Amino acid sequence: MRISFHTIKNYWLYFFGSIGLLLVIAWTNLPYWAKFFVFVLFSYVLGRLFAVYKKKYSEDVIRNGILGAMGIFAIMFVVGALVPVLGYQVGVGLFFALLSLLIARIVLRFSEKGSEYKKWLSGAGIGIFGLYVAYDTNNILKRADYYQGDFITASMDYYLDIINLVRDVMQINN
């Protein structure tokens, strides 16, 4: 697949724009209506960013990615709702696992590793984000003070978990 310079330029604009919007949601004390507006704008920008997947993957792979992520989300939601309170250490462990995954993916971009390594990393991502769903569910249900009534940030946590699950399931199915 050949990607034009214009597409690459737009990709980076949407990529950094989505990170900026995400930081606005996470690190500001905007009123709920303003956070909701930023969340909707973030969803739009992320949709534009993911439009590249329509060119990269077949419709069946995308559908299977969505359905697979929905199944994983449902199972891990139940696990998160049924498990006693998951402590701070679980969150720290998941953060470092996610950071390790990010570093491995960056290294993979610049290395000559094959698609098997990419699939292995996607499988690791599915595991990590599946556990994040359980952890986020546990925080929402068992510790309402964690979000201090900020349902937009709680929704953003779920949204990012789902997006990452879909992406990783699509990479494994491809």
Predicted regions and their residues:
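A hydrophobic alpha-helical transmembrane-helix feature that marks the membrane cores
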Residues: 1-174
